[in-house]
Amino acid sequence: MADKEATVYIVDVGRSMGECRNGRSVTDLEWAMQYVWDRITGTVATGRKTAMMGVIGLRTDETSNELEDDVHFSHIAVLSNLKQFLMPDIRKLEDELKPSKTDKGDAISAIILAIQMIITHCKKLKYRRKIVLVTNGQGRMSDEDLGEIVKKVKEDNIELVVMGIDFDDPEYGYKEEDKDPHKAENETLLRTLVEDCDGVYGTFEQAVAELDIPRVKSVRSVASFKGYLQLGNPEEYDSALRIPVERYYRTYPAKPPTASSFVLRSEPEAGQEEAESSEAAAATQKGSQSGDAGLTTVRTMRTYQVEDKSAPGGKIDIERDELAKGYEYGRTAVHISETDENITILDTFAGLELMGFIQTDQYQRYMHMSNTNIIIAQRANDKAALALSSFIHALFELECYAVARLVVKENKPPVIVLLAPSIEPEYECLLEVQLPFAEDVRTYRFPPLDKVITVSGKVVTQHRNLPSDDLLDVMGKYVNSMELVDADEDGDPVETFPIDDSYSPVLHRIDAAIRARAIHPDQPIPPPSERLTKFSHPREDLIEKSQKHLEKLIEIADVKKVPPKAKGRKRTRETEKPLSGLDVDALLHHEKRVKISPNNAIPEFKQTLAQAENIEAIKDATKQMMVIVEDQIKHSLGNANYDRVIEALGTMRDELVSYEEPASYNDFLGQLKDKLLQEKLGGDRQELWWLVRRNKLGLVTQRESDQSRVTDTEAKEVSLTKMKE
């Protein structure tokens, strides 16, 4: 369980915070709120009820706090007491944090008030307590009783953080020129207070610059297995090895937040209110707790139906309890009763049993099948730690890996895992990955890349499809020039692509977008951080460094640019010439097709359109396809020809849209529907029209083709018209 937290933010909203300084285009308050919103929304995103936050406004127009009778606490307002923040709290806070019309208000008194809030809320319970002061240091600050403040902060273990706008920070290397003497005194006062409290003092120059750095979520470790690492059967042999161990994730994919479905809540009618189920009530309550009273969660309802010709609609509803499980065997379902279902479950017992050992040079890395886990000795068990350490060192010295059978829980399927020793200063463990069974391995045979084997079995090493020695040499130089490892001042290799700086673009981009929309629902989402996109493209220095090798590679490999695929009207498009320059049609002596054969209708229809020189030829080919399609429908025994008809209609639709003749298809489809409606094509063909709708082969609309005169509404009306009333 995560630690309880209590954080109070003191935000300076004085009149001076509404000014723009030092060449910035935003006010001091807007600049400071970037940091405050980042911290608040980051806490809200966790959804933890134990993460409490409070907000105090400093130098406000009004006074609202429990010590407001004291003149020292005037112009200080408690905007939010310590509580779990939700979306409405963020929206409310955004409206209240605006520059005031006064510069009166004491930051030191605001710190005292924040201490009082934390003490009242946390009492003597275990909390991580924190006060964050955000100010530009322009107001009046009292230096009375600083010793008592420091004593109380240390006594209650409160972390004091002061973030100042344009504050001097020698450690970061920032110094404001022509600083106001009064502000310089306030900075010195706050720095002394923070240093005495062992807190954190910084300038917003550094804080805002570091906002682009994605924060990696700290995950509390939870054991996925607790049991024994054993060699041999300890129940039968006294010499069997048995070590208590625990298993934890070493790598596990971090997943971005998932979207949930919500609907606007509508007030139930009088008759429906009593019929509301407890599940719906719970969903409504959950929706209101989520922070928006206008939304409610969507309930999922699943029904099961079976065919019954005697029932209305041809189907009847059945309960889930009436269903039975079955396994597909060929095209038949084999039913296994619940009493016999135990035969499909393998009886296993939790444990990690060693099966054997393998030399490190004989193991192939592609055998990894899972995330990486670590195996450590049972916590607070010195005997187990000593035994496991001996086992790890033995594997390391013999350059071996161990192969083991792992069952995480009783009656869970067993997996085969590989155990590799990992020894670091003051830390030892076994790295564990899952290995495949025989059925998990995919073995494929591909032709070799360094030779060509002819039909007669002859091996050819010099071929136009094989790289030459010059090509291999140039490719090697090009690859080396793109190396991601640089050298430092001493010539030692330095990793250019450290894993600690390679953040997940999807995860952090979605998180940043959600937080931006939560704070500013009407403003556009800002672009992604450069830290997330810097690995989307090669580095400029590497591109420049490798350019000469790339040009040499293009020259030797004889790389040619493929001409782009022509776009536009198919019937006015020139025939694309192959790279060889040969006229394939002239070589094959293709004659222009006059009549389309029903046995090969689709290919011949495409070929006829490709050879068409005018619109009349396109319309003639369309008419021929109309006759063929209608004939297939008329002579279809049941739905035997329906698949062929649907394929033909889809081809006609796509081709005629490409040739900018959607009217021909729309006219044909209208005629086809009329004939189906009047049962002129072999009787009742309602199922065929349903297939036309399901495959989205309706009229071509203006949205799909500029040459069409059919609107979406008209197309929908034609598609949804019933075949029979």
From Swiss-Prot:
EC annotation from Swiss-Prot or TrEMBL: 3.6.4.12
Enzyme class, first EC level, given as a word: hydrolase
Ku domain sequence ranges: 229-481
Pfam families listed in its UniProt record: Ku, Ku_N, Ku_PK_bind
Bias (Polar residues) ranges: 285-298
Chemical reaction(s) catalysed: ATP + H2O = ADP + phosphate + H(+)
Gene3D superfamilies: 1.10.1600.10, 2.40.290.10, Ku, C-terminal domain, von Willebrand factor, type A domain
A GO molecular-function descriptor: damaged DNA binding
Family stated for the protein in its record: Belongs to the ku80 family.
Subunit description: Heterodimer of Ku70 and Ku80.
Protein name stated in the entry: ATP-dependent DNA helicase II subunit 2
